Amino acid sequence: MKEINELKFYDKMANWDFSQIKYKEQNKTNWDFYKKIKENTNEKSLCLDLGTGGGENVLKHYPNVGMIIATDFSKEMIKTAKENYKNYPNKNIKFTLMNNLEMTFPKEIFDLISARHTIINAKQIYECLVDGGTLVIRGVDQKDCWEIKELFGRGQAYKDEMPISEKDYLDLKEAGFTKIEKVQILHNEYYKTEDDLMALLLKTPILDDYSEIKNEDFVHKPIIEEEKFNEYVTKYKIEKGILLKRVYYGIIAKK
């Protein structure tokens, strides 16, 4: 089950900051998570950000709204977020500990709920949104980093029969959302050195062999086989850097 696996992994992460990893980005799809949030909010909107992690993204990129409640199920993440908040004293935001699957807010309170690379409970989100409220999701899809997953023969959601993007879509439809837009987001990353790419793979669950759908035990595997890694680097190293093809999905759902 996606929920169990992600809880086990992210609860161990005290910092989700990749600033030390050197890479360049190339967006191939015109769909920006924070622009979509801005398009669906105003300066009075009450927003909920699920799975906020260490707060780096919500603090830097969230638009100017009335108030942001930012939650995460990891105590270490929330601790980090509160430390990062000290650098943004004018941001109207509150960080609080909460499991996305057991939301503790009143019904029909939020104008917008955002969820970036995290688990969701579609029914509870629907209940917490005001009529006409918006849900904005950006997630990691099954085909993300597919070339390196195929080379290693394993990876996050590698063997799943249904992409997590489709599961989220169906869950939202069942919860009661009537207007749902889902898009595939293609994004290239070019890592400056082998060490930069290795740092990413060691820190993230990209090559962890677990299901996003099934209820399976999950242990983060911080070991990358050198021979296969070198084979990938040889094949995908170009002038811009070492190419990693990212595949995400975006969803906008209206209540």
Language model features: what each stretch is:
Residues 161-176:
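Short alpha-helix
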Residues 1-41:
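Conserved class I S-adenosyl-L-methionine
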Residues 46-102:
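Class I SAM-dependent methyltransferase SAM/SAH-binding core
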Residues 122-136:
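A short glycine-rich, Lys/Arg-flanked "PGG" loop and its adjoining helix->strand segment in the class I
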Residues 101-112:
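A short acidic, Gly/Pro-enriched loop at the edge of an enzyme's catalytic core
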Residues 181-255:
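Conserved Class I S-adenosyl-L-methionine
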Residues 110-124, 139-141:
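A short SAM/SAH-binding and catalytic strip from SAM-dependent methyltransferases
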Residues 141-159:
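Short, glycine-/aromatic-enriched active-site segment of Class I SAM-dependent methyltransferases
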